[in-house]
């Protein structure tokens, strides 16, 4: 009887370790950090606005969708942002550092995605009065993993509402006027949803079945010993 109980306890402990290990592996695969750059719209040229975006960003997959969490400095200058038509969801603010972290739904974590930015400045910059109010397109270049897929589709935020694009000059920092952009945001097709591997869900089921079988076996043995 003692030997049976030892086997039973060892098996239970092993199952707990296995389930915890695979659960942690699944969670680790669905979140992490990614480096990125902010480009002038539809180019490979780094935007001066890139300096106002802290690196790296964080990504997370939840409910089959991909999200990135981006932190900006000079937060009070940047009055609005969107990526692939999805408006920002502000999740935290740091008034002392003038920073905020916003979450965006995205279609992928690696490659270019289009975004929009609203900038309003009415204060002294480098000791001189400066006023600037503009809305323009930018391009994010994500350098994240390619094996984390989501079922995201681009949002339907008014794609033609931007009054200009950050292509050739950086209005947010130079104050130069920019020509109106008639180009629609070009959004690449989202990746198909690979989903979480099936074995992640099968492991707890198999473990439960094994636990039930062992329990019945132990009870049967115990009953036999009593009789």
From Swiss-Prot:
Residues 161-172 have a biased composition (Low complexity). One of its GO terms (cellular component) is peptidoglycan-based cell wall. Residues 193-227 form a propeptide. GO terms for molecular function: hemoglobin binding; metal ion binding. The modification Pentaglycyl murein peptidoglycan amidated threonine is found at residue 192. SUPFAM superfamilies: NEAT domain-like. Residues 173-182 have a biased composition (Polar residues). Induction: Repressed by fur in the presence of iron. Residues 1-28 form the signal peptide. CDD domains: NEAT. Residues 29-150 form the NEAT domain. A motif (NPQTN sorting signal) lies at residues 189-193. Residues 149-191 are annotated as: Disordered. InterPro entries: Haem_uptake_protein_IsdC, IsdA, NEAT_dom, NEAT_dom_sf, Sortase_SrtB_sig_NPQTN. Keywords: Cell wall, Heme, Iron, Metal-binding, Peptidoglycan-anchor, Secreted, Signal. One of its GO terms (biological process) is heme transport. It is a peptidoglycan-anchor. PROSITE patterns: NEAT. It is found in: Secreted, Cell wall. Involved in heme (porphyrin) scavenging. Binds hemoglobin and almost exclusively free-base protoporphyrin IX. Probably has a role as the central conduit of the isd heme uptake system, i.e. mediates the transfer of the iron-containing nutrient from IsdABH to the membrane translocation system IsdDEF. Hemin-free IsdC (apo-IsdC) acquires hemin from hemin-containing IsdA (holo-IsdA) probably through the activated holo-IsdA-apo-IsdC complex and due to the higher affinity of apo-IsdC for the cofactor. The reaction is reversible. Monomer. Interacts with IsdA. The NEAT domain binds Fe(3+) heme iron. Reduction of the high-spin Fe(3+) heme iron to high-spin Fe(2+) results in loss of the heme from the binding site of the protein due to the absence of a proximal histidine. This is Iron-regulated surface determinant protein C. The gene is isdC.
